[in-house]
Amino acid sequence: LRDLGYDVERIEKRARTRIRYTQKKFSPQRQLAATAALEHITAIMADGLLRNDAYMADAHPALARLWRWHALEETEHKAVAFDVYNQVCGSRKLLRRAMLMGTFFFVLDTTRGLAHMLKVDGLLWNWRVWRDGIRWMWGKEGVFRPLISAYLDFFKDGFHPWEHNNLDLLHATREEFDGAPLIQAGAA
């Protein structure tokens, strides 16, 4: 990304600053609630990626494989922080508030990163790029639209991440990687 002109250090610094602030100002229970909430977001995104090959259809094969592996990893541990949180604290109110705040900052930070990359590419003010991007994310066949229901499930009383049972998908995807290194020598 640096070679393409993106200021990776700036993006990483913003993330480090947010993490340090959270560690300084938030209780351990609130930090754990935020982790559980954000893990739900990454889990439902991972599920979407694993279910829809079209999302990575135009990606370089090594990059597509890396993203599938990462989605697999996110799926495997999707309930760990949630289960620990329930044992340690268990407040649904705090968990819901953490999801709302986590969602806000997730959207804010990813939009800032996207805007930086579009600016570097000279596309920040290209309305067609924004229109097409919004359609790709939220349109009828968009990436995020199918995730709305799973996202909202988090706010239900008694919800647990494994209620979105995708063990079949997890096992099928794991078969792609068992016995094979993520990036083989000479690949890429």
Predicted regions and their residues:
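Non-heme di-metal
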Residues: 1-188
